[in-house]
Amino acid sequence: MDPERCAPFSVGPAAGPYAAAGDEAPGPQGTPDAAPHLHPAPPRGPRLSRFPACGPLEPYLPEPAKPPAKYLQDLGPGPVLNGGHFYEGSAEAEEKASKAASFPQLPVDCRGGPRDGPSNVQASPGPCLASLSVPLSPGLPDSMELAKTKSKKRRNRTTFSTFQLEELEKVFQKTHYPDVYAREQLALRTDLTEARVQVWFQNRRAKWRKRERYGKMQEGRNPFTTAYDISVLPRTDSHPQLQNSLWPSPGSGSPGGPCLMSPEGIPSPCMSPYSHSHGNVAGFMGVPASPAAHPGIYSIHGFPPALGGHSFEPSPDGDYKSPSLVSLRMKPKEPPGLLNWTT
């Protein structure tokens, strides 16, 4: 070998772990006291690999890594875990795992390993799946079958004809609770079953009770409509001559008009708007019938009390028209002469 081509190595203060056991530490000048026979450290990475290996460095070069032959001999077709194959080469492990997970296990002929080609996988797994005795979802109920059974129990609605409804209504007008014999006879006439006739009467009674309750509620809300009938009150169009005779001309024989009470106590149209037979107004209000005793009664229409002691003759017509509500409506249309008295 050529010693000039070899790279010089400087020994540091510490020899390191690769120093020999019999070597001594170097002196302060960096030279050993005795022949040290030191060996340099082997290269650890690319930083030390730039020096060429020559001479005594060759035995210390690392050898290329080789896989152990013993490990390759023990290695099987699949990965090894704790001394046994993981899932490909061990069927017992798969059975234990499937039993622990409570899932049905497929037969071995129905499945292929991940390393098998597409030719080894069966195209139709139907017969293999049919061999399973455990259902795919044993804990879930079959909701589709339950829905079918419920839909079958539902009965169709019965459509009654006009003749059947008439016959049923006739019997219902007679009695709301027909006995079994009457229901059977009615079922024969209407071509229905006795059960359908009974159900129809139950529904008809419920409908009748509902209408009765609704009618009572309406009567309780509007009691005036049942106590008084508006049609009995006189209308204005039925007495057109009453409007002309209410206010006679100033030249007539009765200056007071029909709004004054006659001595006989017959009420005038202005005092009694309703056609009730109460006698005179004074008697109806609970006061004596004498017009001279209480002249203040005539102040209702604005007449002075002095007119209470005078007696007036009835109107020239001689007949008293039936009073009505129109007299109250005509009250604001009093003649100017009567309005001047009140002021």
Curated annotation (Swiss-Prot):
GO molecular function: DNA binding; DNA-binding transcription factor activity; DNA-binding transcription factor activity, RNA polymerase II-specific; sequence-specific double-stranded DNA binding
Domain of life: Eukaryota
Tissue specificity as recorded in UniProt: Predominantly in neural crest-derived mesenchyme and in lateral plate mesoderm. Prominent expression in frontonasal head mesenchyme and in the first and second pharyngeal arches and some of their derivatives. High expression is also seen in the tail and in many derivatives of the lateral plate mesoderm including the limbs, the body wall, and the genital tubercle.
InterPro entries: HD, Homeobox_CS, Homeodomain-like_sf, Paired_Homeobox_TFs
Subcellular location per the Swiss-Prot or TrEMBL entry: Nucleus
CDD domains: homeodomain
Similarity comment: Belongs to the paired homeobox family.
Name the record gives this protein: Homeobox protein aristaless-like 3
Gene coding for it: Alx3
